[in-house]
């Protein structure tokens, strides 16, 4: 087994390598003067079980091309099996046609990764579970809920006062999975999105007065949904609001927006390498998925079941 990484999340890749007790593979990913991406594998991989860790986060297209070119390089270097480990799968929010004459970009990206020569995909908290079916190869979609649950139990001494909140109807399944971990109540924020990047909170379904609310979602981008949801929960009597989000996209002015919000804390994973601005934010904290991803890689390499990681 050999683990390699592109440029999108070297910090996570190094942490995963430490968990696996193996060195990170030697590969050069650089650009020519015209910005074309060039990859050179600097060690023998013939007959090896190769894992490439690369989130397709901002700049999404550059990191996607890095991944595709790395897959091609390993295929042409006679690797026995190639697994793409994609903690954050870009284009996942384009999983269906929202209107006429529009693409299903998530399916296109899945096709590109498959055609490049990968044998298996390992990812985390896909925005829509059906994206697994976009791949014609084995695909494991891990869940960050176990990592979040451990953090919640360490943070809150009185779990009986915790309510898990889904910021919209679509995230109820994810929120329920966390709530079951410590037998917490569930609430839902019913909102209406007026235009892209903005949301209007309408009402709260569930009892939140006097409770510590945990907002659970897969992606935080502009931060508007979270901030509006926090305002609505506090207006309905919540004692505090903390958000647990898997993928911290945090584009534009999101960090400043969240820093100035009523959120007690935003907890994100390192599926996307955090910027210095994120690390310096007073109410944003990063928890690591390195052990989860490392264990999944180890079990995949040894042909063991990964199903227990979903529990």
Swiss-Prot record:
Organism the protein comes from: Mesorhizobium japonicum (strain LMG 29417 / CECT 9101 / MAFF 303099)
Family classification: Belongs to the ribose-phosphate pyrophosphokinase family. Class I subfamily.
Function: Involved in the biosynthesis of the central metabolite phospho-alpha-D-ribosyl-1-pyrophosphate (PRPP) via the transfer of pyrophosphoryl group from ATP to 1-hydroxyl of ribose-5-phosphate (Rib-5-P).
Active-site residues annotated for this sequence: 191
GO process terms (BP): 5-phosphoribose 1-diphosphate biosynthetic process; purine nucleotide biosynthetic process; ribonucleoside monophosphate biosynthetic process
Pathway annotation from the record: Metabolic intermediate biosynthesis; 5-phospho-alpha-D-ribose 1-diphosphate biosynthesis; 5-phospho-alpha-D-ribose 1-diphosphate from D-ribose 5-phosphate (route I): step 1/1
Protein name per the record: Ribose-phosphate pyrophosphokinase
Binding site for Mg(2+) 1: 127
Cofactor: Mg(2+)
Gene coding for it: prs
Binding site for Mg(2+) 2: 168
Molecular function, one GO term: ribose phosphate diphosphokinase activity
Catalytic activity field: D-ribose 5-phosphate + ATP = 5-phospho-alpha-D-ribose 1-diphosphate + AMP + H(+)
Residues at which ATP binds: 34-36, 93-94
